[in-house]
Amino acid sequence: MNTSHKTLKTIAILGQPNVGKSSLFNRLARERIAITSDFAGTTRDINKRKIALNGHEVELLDTGGMAKDALLSKEIKALNLKAAQMSDLILYVVDGKSIPSDEDLKLFREVFKTNPNCFLVINKIDNDKEKERSYAFSSFGTPKSFNISVSHNRGISALIDAVLNALNLNQIIEQDLDADILESLETPNNALEETKEEEIIQVGIIGRVNVGKSSLLNALTKKERSLVSSVAGTTIDPIDETILIGDQKICFVDTAGIRHRGKILGIEKYALDRTQKALEKSHIALLVLDVSAPFVELDEKISSLADKHSLGIILILNKWDIRYAPYEEIMATLKRKFRFLEYAPVITTSCLKARHIDEIKHKIIEVYECFSKRIPTSSLNSVIFQATQKHPLPSDGGKLVKVYYATQFATKPPQISLIMNRPKALHFSYKRYLINTLRKEFNFLGTPLILNAKDKKSVQQN
């Protein structure tokens, strides 16, 4: 190992919560040190570790997430910026499966202003087809960006090489490759395995404890694969089972039930972390709701997980045979409480009696087709043009607002860029109008549709 440098080079991993900072820290450190979870703000303190990158000893810092609304956010942000100032290199991690927010861009610019020796690391780019997702981050304006997937170990070697070059630690060191290093290398076999995985629809079953998730899994697979009990929280680890419908493979993941945060202790915290990991790899969520009693606030919070992970979603109303109210009342309440999921199909069932199970299976395939849909550019622009003609864009301070053209740059979920002269003038209500128009024309059943306004000049520059 090279120890010729008396002062170790320091690398800080920064970014908003839930983007994979701690997972990257663990990957680079080659052991599980930081607690990783998909709940925003898991890392509160700065984790410091001496590690070896290709034989070079460096100091790695994993920082708390910099979310604006996080508890202790001001203190965490100040600590982050101090770490950035003291570091030789910053790895600013973003979630490649999401559209960058104004807050994302603002935080990155603050960090970059503090220390320009900064790499933009776009995580969760799990395969070649998802590379187009990284285009959404072109507005960050940095030439030093890297597409990686920590969970699939993609792009990590290239990132390490770039880090060593930036720190002037790029001399070749002769050393024996141990088993861990060999195991971490990206190989064509890994790529082939990922291609096979893409052919399987990944479905996460989510809901509160004891709403019937395990019973639903058993009914879907016709197996007693998941332990069913009246004791809340029977399922601890996610349990998966693959079935075949025609030529289509569907992998179901029965996740641990989620209860109020204040009651999460010990092994349930572990179970909740595993649930979040399972959802990150899912395409579609089956949100199971118990209609033997009125909906509760936690049902709404859990439903936001599908939105958070940009998943397709199907609402499953379980225990319909013992529902607490008439059909009309339940549907009216559902529409009111889950208004943001108005595009999701609703299926009533009794999992123990296996009612409407085939309908659920076929609806999964239908939603997945919508989730994977790509609209021809000519058709997309025709609909956008007609919509803007029918209801013109409001002016911005007396100045005309134009949409030059639209392009779909990603699927799973569908993501569309509107190339405009004044993108910041696109009001959320008008964006909602365009999304509703696209849903009506192209059928995005159960599928989130992401619309992203971009400046024409920035697109031309990139």
Swiss-Prot record:
Keyword presence, Nucleotide-binding: yes
Keyword terms of this UniProt record: GTP-binding, Nucleotide-binding, Repeat, Ribosome biogenesis
Binding positions for GTP 1 per the UniProt entry: 15-22, 62-66, 123-126
Entry's Gene Ontology BP terms: ribosome biogenesis
UniProt cross-references to CDD domains, sorted A to Z: EngA1 (cd01894), EngA2 (cd01895)
SUPFAM superfamilies registered for this protein in UniProt: P-loop containing nucleoside triphosphate hydrolases
GO MF annotations, alphabetized: GTP binding; ribosome binding
Pfam families: KH_dom-like, MMR_HSR1
Alphabetized Gene3D superfamilies for the sequence: 3.30.300.20, P-loop containing nucleotide triphosphate hydrolases (3.40.50.300)
Every KH-like domain range: 373-457
Binding annotation for GTP 2: 207-214, 254-258, 318-321
Domain EngA-type G: residue ranges: 9-171, 201-372
Superkingdom of origin: Bacteria
UniProt family annotation: Belongs to the TRAFAC class TrmE-Era-EngA-EngB-Septin-like GTPase superfamily. EngA (Der) GTPase family.
Subunit structure: Associates with the 50S ribosomal subunit.
Role this protein plays: GTPase that plays an essential role in the late steps of ribosome biogenesis.
UniProt name for this protein: GTPase Der
Organism the protein comes from: Helicobacter pylori (strain J99 / ATCC 700824) (Campylobacter pylori J99)
Gene: der
